[in-house]
Swiss-Prot record:
The keyword Transferase applies. Keywords: Glycogen biosynthesis, Glycosyltransferase, Transferase. GO terms for molecular function: alpha-1,4-glucan glucosyltransferase (ADP-glucose donor) activity; alpha-1,4-glucan glucosyltransferase (UDP-glucose donor) activity. This is Glycogen synthase. CDD domains: GT5_Glycogen_synthase_DULL1-like. It is an enzyme of class 2 (transferase). InterPro entries: Glyco_trans_1, GS/SS, Starch_synth_cat_dom. ADP-alpha-D-glucose binds at residue 15. It catalyses: [(1->4)-alpha-D-glucosyl](n) + ADP-alpha-D-glucose = [(1->4)-alpha-D-glucosyl](n+1) + ADP + H(+). Its EC number is 2.4.1.21.
Length: 475
């Protein structure tokens, strides 16, 4: 089967969040038994310094704001083809130093138009799998009646809150027909279009990244036209849980840990916990924390509204009052949140048990996973979430809000602790207290939580099998 995956992120070369990990992970898993090609826009951030062979180059034209040209370079990479498409410099859309800007609907629609032209020149494609609203226009362009062939179109919603609102006139410059364009237009304002809306109507099948998040999307009434669109397509919509690359996320081989360990040590829990304690000591020494504070809770997250920054602050106070350690590692994108957390960071510089690191540092984050006893994820909503899966892999018990993929993967008393979907701080603080008390007073129960998490299979194979089931149902 010839499968094309297309997105604007692909770990490790261009990544801002979980999207890059998910696209890489799925592509890698599928490439073990199928012909997989990944299409990415060129960014200055992408530096193909990897030792991959250039296997093809093309120059081709496409329609978007007039006749444009693009240059594609295809590399052989980890059993798949990685094709980077550089748009004509006349538009100068991808010379930015960041993945995302204020002109993203323009930039990613132009890339979608170029990707459609590139795919049209290929001899045969069975499946085109498009990821998130950025690729929304591509679905409509691939459905146009003048296409030389019609690959089946799969679209995955990674975050339903981001939809790609833009002008209808802009999309019309891609050469899409009036009928195709109507799938994107808003009824309430035909001069405006939504990339995600059009993708829902134009794709053969739609997925999202967890079963519970799929139900939450169906119950989302924040925009009645988007609700109508997803309800009209609910018979070809499902949630497939993301996985993690268990080779990349492996405490047995992770070079960032002070001491390695594995689930094989579950037969010798004292040895397992001793090794985690050694990682904890290494982290405490690195961050200047006092060894007397235990357990260690961590938060590894983007610090944005979605992730519940007000609950993170509540966790800081709870840690101070209850004598345990808390380490927060994350990046802020909102200036106001950045200001507040920078002030918190500075005020806690000499704290014996709290540290805030406002910079995502992968080796440090990995050491935190290996050192921590528990990981807290208080997100207001979480389409899937990967940090709870990584945490369990490293023997770190997740404490989460019961929403989206967190609800699908964490069960109180089985492999972690949960609190309700309401914004009730008492529920959240009760969860924290229960977790701390269990750790301190019920070591046998705590070990069972760790064991269940470490034995859980969260790899890529299961995710790939589910997607192959969708692909095969369409062919």
């Amino acid at each position: 089967m010839k499968i094309i995956q297309t997105a604007v992120e692909f770990a490790p070369f261009i990544k801002a969040g979980g999207l890059g990990d998910a696209v890489y992970g799925l592509s890698k898993a599928l490439s073990e038994s199928h012909d997989v090609e990944v299409l990415l826009p060129f960014f200055p951030l992408i530096t193909p310094s990897f030792s991959s062979q250039v296997i093809d180059e093309k120059v081709f034209s496409y329609e978007f704001l007039g006749r444009q040209h693009a240059h594609s370079i295809s590399y052989s990479y980890e059993g798949m083809i990685l094709t980077i498409i550089k748009l004509d410099s006349q538009l100068d859309l991808f010379s930015t130093s960041t993945i995302y800007t204020e002109d993203d609907t323009l930039r990613f629609s132009a890339f979608s138009a170029a990707a459609a032209a590139y795919i049209g020149e290929l001899d045969h494609v069975d499946i085109v799998h498009m990821h998130d609203w950025h690729m929304g226009l591509l679905s409509g362009l691939l459905k146009e009646p003048n296409r030389p062939h019609y690959p089946k179109r799969i679209f995955t919603i990674h975050n339903f809150s981001y939809r790609g609102y833009c002008s209808t006139q802009l999309l019309g410059t891609s050469g899409i027909s009036d009928f195709g364009l109507s799938n994107y237009q808003l009824y309430r304002d035909p001069q405006m279009s939504v990339l995600l809306k059009g993708a829902l109507y134009c794709s053969d099948y739609i997925t999202t990244v967890s079963p519970t998040y799929a139900q939450e999307i169906l119950n989302d009434y924040s925009d009645y036209e988007m609700h109508d669109a997803i309800m009209a397509r609910r018979h070809v919509f499902c949630g497939i849980l993301n996985g993690i690359d268990e080779q990349i996320w492996n405490p047995e081989t992770d070079a960032s840990l002070a001491v390695n360990y594995s689930k094989d040590l579950l037969d010798a829990p004292d040895v397992l916990f001793t090794k985690k304690e050694e990682n904890k000591n290494a982290l405490y020494e690195k961050l200047g924390l006092s060894y007397e504070y235990s357990p260690l809770m961590c938060i590894i997250s983007r610090i944005v509204e979605q992730k519940g920054p007000e609950f993170m602050k509540a966790a800081i106070l709870h840690a101070m009052e209850n004598g345990y350690a808390l380490v927060i590692v994350g990046t802020c994108y909102d200036p106001e949140i950045q200001r507040k957390f920078t002030n918190l960071q500075e005020s806690l510089t000499t704290s014996p048990n709290i540290r805030i690191i406002l910079d995502y540092n992968d080796p440090l984050a990995r050491l935190v996973y290996g050192a921590a006893d528990m990981i807290c994820i208080p997100s207001h909503f979480e389409p899937c979430g990967l940090t709870q899966l990584i945490g369990m892999r490293y023997g770190t018990v997740p404490l989460v809000r019961s929403t989206g993929g967190l609800a699908d993967t964490v069960v109180t008393g089985i492999n972690g602790f949960t609190f309700s979907q309401t914004d009730n701080f008492n529920d959240f603080l009760h969860m924290l207290t229960l977790a701390i008390t269990t750790y301190r007073q019920e070591p046998d129960i705590w070990f069972q939580l760790v064991e269940e998490g470490m034995l859980r299979s969260s790899g890529l194979t299961t995710m790939a099998i589910h997607y192959l089931g969708v692909y095969n149902s369409l062919l």
